[in-house]
Amino acid sequence: MTDKFPEDVKFLYIAYTPAKADITACGIPIPLDFDKEFRDKTVVIVAIPGAFTPTCTANHIPPFVEKFTALKSAGVDAVIVLSANDPFVQSAFGKALGVTDEAFIFASDPGAEFSKSAGLSLDLPPAFGTRTARYAIIVSNGVVKYVEKDSEGVAGSGVDAVLAAL
């Protein structure tokens, strides 16, 4: 795939700081302007239906944390873990997984708007609402190099598939 990544994509996140390292510490959400921050970089966006959910917590995101050095060695400048959860939940999720690197970002896709626009959202029962699907995207210099959505498991959106696609 060689499509241009959409312009004007903005997520919300809370930047990790040592002063706010405690999982209960609340930072202030700020915009993550994809165009501005990642224009000439290689970024992996890995989306999850929800922070602290079984597959996301046990099988999907921990391998990205464990293989972050390998991702950087393969040319990745940043990893963005994306969900429709609010930025406070995303921040706590990153802290719970022990992530402290500023290039490993836990961001919110409010209302799953970006994911919906890309055809990568899920409509779950009313108690859960619209969520981001489980997917991975590799964007390099503003061009989408890889997109894979999983309906079950993490075969296409997991770290091994992402590393193989780099």
From Swiss-Prot:
- UniProt EC number: 1.11.1.-
A cellular component term from Gene Ontology for this protein is: mitochondrion
Q: Name one GO biological process term.
A: cellular response to oxidative stress
* Transmembrane spans: none
Kindly list the GO molecular function terms attached to this UniProt entry: thioredoxin peroxidase activity
Q: Could you tell me the keywords of this UniProt record?
A: Antioxidant, Disulfide bond, Oxidoreductase, Peroxidase, Redox-active center
Q: Which residues form the active site?
A: C56
Where do the Thioredoxin domain residues begin and end? 5-166
Reactions that this protein is recorded to catalyse: a hydroperoxide + [protein]-dithiol = [protein]-disulfide + an alcohol + H2O
Instruction: Give, as one word, the top-level EC class.
Output: oxidoreductase
**Matches recorded under InterPro entries:** PRX5-like, Redoxin, Thioredoxin-like_sf, Thioredoxin_domain
Further comment found in the protein's record: The active site is a conserved redox-active cysteine residue, the peroxidatic cysteine (C(P)), which makes the nucleophilic attack on the peroxide substrate. The peroxide oxidizes the C(P)-SH to cysteine sulfenic acid (C(P)-SOH), which then reacts with another cysteine residue, the resolving cysteine (C(R)), to form a disulfide bridge. The disulfide is subsequently reduced by an appropriate electron donor to complete the catalytic cycle. In this typical 2-Cys Prx, C(R) is provided by the other dimeric subunit to form an intersubunit disulfide.
Record's subunit section: Homodimer; disulfide-linked, upon oxidation.
Family assignment from sequence similarity: Belongs to the peroxiredoxin family. Prx5 subfamily.
Q: What does this protein do?
A: Thiol-specific peroxidase that catalyzes the reduction of hydrogen peroxide and organic hydroperoxides to water and alcohols, respectively. Plays a role in cell protection against oxidative stress by detoxifying peroxides and as sensor of hydrogen peroxide-mediated signaling events.
Q: What is this protein called?
A: Putative peroxisomal peroxiredoxin
Q: Which organism is it from?
A: Lipomyces kononenkoae
